[in-house]
Swiss-Prot record:
This is Chromo domain-containing protein rhino. It comes from the Eukaryota. Residues 152-167 have a biased composition (Polar residues). Pfam families: Chromo. Involved in piRNA (piwi-interacting RNA)-mediated transposon repression. May be involved in formation of the perinuclear nuage, a subcellular structure implicated in RNA processing that may be involved in transposon RNA surveillance and silencing. Required for ping-pong amplification during piRNA biogenesis, probably by promoting transcription of piRNA precursors. As part of the Rhino-Deadlock-Cutoff (RDC) Complex associates with, and drives non-canonical transcription of germline specific dual-strand piRNA clusters 80F, 38C and 42AB, but not single-stranded piRNA cluster 20A. It comes from Drosophila melanogaster. The lineage of its organism: Eukaryota, Metazoa, Ecdysozoa, Arthropoda, Hexapoda. Residues 218-228, 276-285 have a biased composition (Basic and acidic residues).
Length: 418
């Protein structure tokens, strides 16, 4: 085949001749930027106005490295000039009108460092003088406050004692401050024990102060014998509480009763009931029935007067009931609420008194149903002459009635799921 009839190569494009290619000359580099981390330069083309300037990647201007270096040197010179102006403005001396840094040599850097150190030293000295003047002024104004603080105090102020006129404690007359103090009997008694205040001439305050120190409070325990039916932990807490209250009432003041309304809501016990309760503790140990009777009589006074002494029969009944009640309460307290189980009566299959199954001695009539439990197979069968249905093990009847068993299993239908 000739060359004219060859297939053209679609992948190749014929380039125009080199004679018609225009060459563009770079006149100057005007700017620099970064796009996606890659540097680009603003190129001014010779023979074209500034509107035709283009951004070219730095790789495309490799033959213009002299112009790129000239642009970088110009940028460095401008940055250096701006830094020199900023340093000149920060100086306080008026003589420094122009920038001092002209060369980047070692001698110029030493001079600038020495000058900056001298300026910093002058500034720190001026600030220290200003601080000293301020401190002197503060000391002059604080002299009066020191005199007030050093004034001797005649009485320890507190929030519970000082009234609305308590700001006069630090005045020149210490005697006037003591008259403006509100004296509560409890605080006064505490201060009198510690000798913090002088005894006052008011009769009302002296009467309300405590004359005798309060007695120590303790719970009264019942003496027990070896044959006592119950321990001290089974004693009702109401009786111990009511016996300890007379001791508490003897230690309280009239001022304590007037301080809060919550103290009035507490149960009070009369002198007669307290004497009776103390007599009970001094006598012989009581049984649980007598203790219950005494607590009930103390709760209702008129009901106790109408009732007589407890009989022996009643005490015995109370004791018998209390043992069962205590045992139930203790069992309920031991296990938490979530773990408590309901108690059901024991269920047992009734014992067979009559013959059952093969023991009937009758012939097999029909096999009705079968069920398997674990590895055992049971058959529901009826006997001839008996209407009841019995469940027997297959091993008991497979030797005597094999044909009927086979006939039953053949009659079953096998259901295949769809």
């Amino acid at each position: 085949m000739s060359r004219n009839h060859q297939r053209p190569n679609l992948g190749l494009v014929d380039a125009p001749p080199n004679d018609h290619v225009e060459e563009y000359v770079v006149e100057k580099i005007l700017g620099k930027r970064f796009v996606n981390g890659r540097p680009q330069v603003l190129v001014k083309w010779s023979g074209f106005p500034n509107e035709n300037n283009t951004w070219e990647p730095l790789e495309n201007v490799g033959n213009c490295m002299k112009l790129v270096s000239d642009f970088e040197s110009e940028v460095f010179r401008l940055h250096r000039k701006a830094a020199a102006k900023s340093v000149g403005k920060s100086k306080s001396s008026p003589s420094s009108s122009g920038p001092l840094i002209t060369e980047n040599g070692p001698s110029s850097s030493k001079k600038t460092q020495q000058h900056s150190k001298s300026v910093q030293a002058k500034n720190t000295a001026g600030m220290s003088k200003m601080n000293q003047k301020k401190g002197k002024n503060i000391k002059k104004t604080a002299g009066k406050i020191k005199d007030i603080e050093n004034y001797p105090k005649t009485q320890m102020p507190s929030t519970s004692q000082v009234s609305t006129d308590s700001t006069e404690v630090f005045d020149g007359n210490p005697s006037a401050t003591t008259t403006n103090m509100i004296k509560s009997p409890r605080i006064q008694s505490l201060f009198s024990d510690l000798n913090l205040i002088e005894p006052t001439k008011d009769k009302d305050v002296g009467d309300t102060s405590l004359k005798t120190p309060p007695k120590s409070r303790r719970l009264i325990e019942f003496p027990q014998r070896e044959d006592a039916p119950l321990s001290s932990k089974h004693v009702s807490p109401m009786l111990i509480r009511k016996e300890s209250q007379p001791l508490q009432s003897s230690c309280t003041d009239d001022s304590d009763l007037g301080e809060s309304s919550s103290s009035m809501s507490l149960p009070t016990v009369s002198s007669t009931s307290s004497e009776k309760s103390i007599k009970v503790t001094k006598s012989e140990p009581k049984t649980l029935g007598q203790i219950k009777f005494s607590s009930r009589s103390s709760d209702g006074g008129h009901a106790a007067s109408s009732l007589g002494a407890p009989k022996e029969g009643d005490i015995g009944l109370d004791l018998s009931g209390s043992d069962s009640m205590d045992s139930e309460v203790e069992s309920m307290r031991r296990c938490p609420r979530r773990k408590r189980k309901k108690t059901y009566p024991d269920w047992k299959f009734p014992e067979m008194t009559k013959p059952f199954g093969v023991n009937r001695g009758l012939d097999l009539d029909k096999i009705l149903h079968c069920y398997q439990m674990n590895d055992d197979l049971f058959m529901f069968v009826t006997w001839k002459g008996c209407s009841s249905i019995d469940a027997v093990h297959i091993n008991d009847i497979k030797e005597a009635y094999p044909l009927q068993i086979i006939k039953y299993f053949e009659s079953l239908r096998i259901i295949v799921p769809k």
